[in-house]
Amino acid sequence: MKRSISVDSSSPKNVFNPETPNGFDDSVYLNFTSMHSIQPILSRIRELAAITIPKERVPRLCWFKQLLELQAPPEMQRNELPFSVYLISGNAGSGKSTCIQTLNEAIDCIITGSTRVAAQNVHAKLSTAYASRPINTIFHEFGFRGNHIQAQLGRYAYNWTTTPPSIEDLQKRDIVYYWEVLIDITKRVFQMGDDGRGGTSTFKTLWAIERLLNKPTGSMSGTAFIACGSLPAFTRSNVIVIDEAGLLGRHILTAVVYCWWLLNAIYQSPQYINGRKPVIVCVGSPTQTDSLESHFQHDMQRSHVTPSENILTYIICNQTLRQYTNISHNWAIFINNKRCQEDDFGNLLKTLEYGLPITEAHARLVDTFVVPASYINNPANLPGWTRLYSSHKEVSAYMSKLHAHLKLSKNDHFSVFALPTYTFIRLTAFDEYRKLTGQPGLSVEHWIRANSGRLHNYSQSRDHDMGTVKYETHSNRDLIVARTDITYVLNTLVVVTTRLRKLVIGFSGTFQSFAKVLRDDSFVKARGETSIEYAYRFLSNLIFGGLINFYNFLLNKNLHPDKVSLAYKRLAALTLELLSGTNKTPLHEAAVNGAGAGIDCDGAATSADKAFCFTKAPESKVTASIPEDPDDVIFTALNDEVIDLVYCQYEFSYPKSSNEVHAQFLLMKAIYDGRYAILAELFESSFTTAPFSAYVDNVNFNGSELLIGNVRGGLLSLALQTDTYTLLGYTFAPVPVFVEELTRKKLYRETTEMLYALHVPLMVLQDQHGFVSIVNANVCEFTESIEDAELAMATTVDYGLSSKLAMTIARSQGLSLEKVAICFTADKLRLNSVYVAMSRTVSSRFLKMNLNPLRERYEKSAEISDHILAALRDPNVHVVY
């Protein structure tokens, strides 16, 4: 598709123009990632954001305060919370993320994701062009906190009496349903307002200053976020973008609108004073996503998971909401899959996405992907492929079979190892839980089994190959410790299930891959959340320690001797040129000329009778004359003809100022690039693809365990759910920063002491760029909400990892997988799940499945598909190809 520079005259961005009164034009030039078809989307969202409503329709602060006094939530007074919606839907790879990127650059808006994974995916997309501020989940932005996770939803219900219901009825139903969360947020916001915390008086102060200076009302409001960084994002803009909105239940739409009005009313923001209303931009695919709600029944000790209407389906299908939001004029559909390069396969995916008529040609195409289920379930087949299953039970069964196969095959590269996970249960809290739930006979063992999916990440607790649980009672500590071992496979791909701290300690790859990292600054850009100085200092440390790899490469006996000799001379000459302040001492002359004179680190050649010849093994009479100085002893042990002059002439330090840090990095980078160019010219691919590794200290792998003396000089960062890692093993090396983080968690004192004593191992992962990190353990507290009581029940310790060797179809959504083998369950086929599974790969050459779902009985999302087909024919709906 042709890309163009788009211009829109309504943007507030500034481009200098001497003809305008203030010297700036109000037009904006979008970058090359924007398409011509996205311009109408920008214009329409700006129009919606600029709409003002009459003062009588603006929700009053007193209405929110009245809610705090209600005894029965269904008795709350109905009140409209005005809002607008713009819907952006489309199939996988159609350009929705590019549209979000353009919105972020052209409009002052709040970008969010429905989940942490969605938020991190958006952040990764936005960071490709410019440094992006952190992207939070929509829950974080509207005030959802950890204590709301166990809130009982649907405790109260409201039933309207008129049909069809009004928008006020729909909003009241959602507020009553989500009451426990919203009322807690409301209490907290009013407390902040009463205490003057969180910058609640910032805008009022600016109004007063404007009056004193006789400035127009609102002219200084733009400085509020400079004066107070703790202001909620909702007070900054009324345009809220939610990526992957199809994963959210319908009540979240009202929750976002409710909290936007609440926060702006408390803060008395300019957009509240001017009568602006929130514009919720929902991005996602209504046909491939499901919203699920989980209710835990304490009396039965069972989780009840039910599908619920998601936001996108709610907006599209609900007649009242369609009319209120005028959805036909506020809907953009992206329908071209740019990831897939095969016409037939791409057309098949579009057919499944939009519920178009399925033909025999489509079925015959899918026939070519079918192989026996036994072939897919055999771990010896399809190495490197990701298995997708319908249930967690099937995933766990395959992982057990895979581990058994690897143990029998005794494959050193993909060896199997097990590590312990722990759950610490508070005895007093557990006794109180049994009293409140009326279950005096409930055992800890039964409670652990029933709540494993709530204690840990659900996929992690169900998909892993886990051993039997062993229990230890520590009455003097008021604890029961449950331990179970989880089996992992070395050198396989994994993802983290939550955001974890990691300490980057080194790099392992090739000379070429490390040169690429230095060339495009990808490593530095990816660490925008921390000081760039630390990244440069870390890279300088790695380069300095890894320069010896160039000389180690030249020890290869298969290299041409003449080229090796020339390489030594050119490397030494490069060092002479780049190391400032270095003179041509006898040391350099000996190295450049390839002389066999002995060398010491003070730059003087030794006398002939004490010379050590690097080109042949020393004779006994020469060894007898070796000086006793430790440095000289080291160098006389070398049997190469030239040593690396950098380590003799350059003393590596840790500079303090930014200029010195950057200057040191540029010097190290210049040395690496220069050496790389010399050896790449002489030895070509045999050099560029040769292994290169560098660490902050000496490392050694003993099977699956990494041994390292010191992690000083490592770089603290975050392991994100959107990244893919290779599991290199584990380590018991102490990481002081992780110990400090555990102390800051303020866990139950006895639990913390036991954690210190257990000395839990830490995982060692390698990211897709080659950087090796030690990842902190995943320590989480589990608090149970029973009626009005909150019980600190347990603390869990695991590794926060999930394998990419096998997973459920539901969990694969949003992931790009290169090679996919799918095992469908014939009696539970849903067309949207079929689409999700098949669209994880970009090429049909890497797709296998156990049956042809198009020749089986399946469930189809008929209602939403009909609405989308009607929208494609609607001239008011904006279609982007």
Curated annotation (Swiss-Prot):
Keyword Hydrolase attributed: yes
Gene Ontology terms describing biological process: DNA replication
Localisation per UniProt entry: Host nucleus
Keyword list, A-Z: ATP-binding, DNA replication, Helicase, Host nucleus, Hydrolase, Nucleotide-binding
Binding site for ATP: 90-97
GO molecular function, one term: hydrolase activity
Domain of life: Viruses
InterPro entries according to UniProt: DNA_helicase_dom, HSV_HELI, P-loop_NTPase
GO cellular component: host cell nucleus
EC number: 3.6.4.-
Keyword Hydrolase attached: yes
Role played: Component of the helicase/primase complex. Unwinds the DNA at the replication forks and generates single-stranded DNA for both leading and lagging strand synthesis. The primase synthesizes short RNA primers on the lagging strand that the polymerase elongates using dNTPs. Possesses helicase-like motifs and therefore may act as the helicase subunit of the complex.
Subunit architecture: Associates with the primase and the primase-associated factor to form the helicase-primase complex.
Family statement: Belongs to the herpesviridae helicase family.
Protein name: DNA replication helicase
Organism (species): Varicella-zoster virus (strain Oka vaccine) (HHV-3)
Gene name for this UniProt entry: HELI
